[in-house]
Amino acid sequence: MTHYFDKPQKSTYLGFGERPVILVVDLMKGGSMNGLPGRAVRNTRILIQEARKKNVPIGYTVLAYRSDLKDYPPNKLASMKLVMGTESVKVMDEVAPGPEDFVIIKKTNSPFIGTNLLLLLTLMQADTIIVTGRHTSGCIRATAADAFSYGYRTIVPEECVGDGKGILPHKANLCDLHIRGADVLTLREVLEYLGKL
């Protein structure tokens, strides 16, 4: 965390639990990819490969709407044409889900709103949510904030997230998330944790 804080306090870290779940947020073929670092996708792939070796559950979220957009909520962004059943809402090939993974279709920034994600996490007895994907200032922030609010230890590996709006909102939101509930860690720290499971 030295790249966010001059003097990081270990007391500000909540740490990992014992039953993690990886959430890959909105790494879809369609939608706005402007400025999303390729490293976020590559590093998410590394993370999920290691998670599978340890049988850690992996979930994916995708934004997808009806073709008439009647389920598209009020939004400041123009419609991204993310229509259910089209190629644009499929997860990117580099990080595609396996048969053992689960996929959540959502309508808002947070996958906890209007979905069965909370039920799935409860059934898996999860206590730690590791959040990866796009966009740090939108869906990543909303996902991490809600995960923390529901009582989960929330981890954001910095190298596994990116923001289409640029590096400033990316870093500002990571800093704020770390202060307000999530642990923003390095990919190496998360991989070391998985290795001990």
Predicted feature descriptions by range:
Residues 28-35:
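Short acidic, Gly/Ser-rich segments with clustered Asp/Glu that frequently serve as metal-coordination loops
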Residues 23-25:
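Short hydrophobic beta-strand that contains or immediately precedes a catalytic carboxylate
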Residues 51-70:
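Von Willebrand factor
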Residues 35-52:
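…and closely analogous acidic/polar surface helices at protein-protein or active-site interfaces
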Residues 1-21, 49-54, 80-197:
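Active-site-adjacent betaalpha module
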Residues 67-84:
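Acidic/polar short surface loop at catalytic or gating sites that assists cofactor/ion binding
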Residues 27, 63-65, 159:
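Active-site loop/turn elements of alpha/beta-hydrolase fold enzymes
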Residues 30, 66-68, 162-163:
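Active-site loop signature of alpha/beta-hydrolase-fold enzymes
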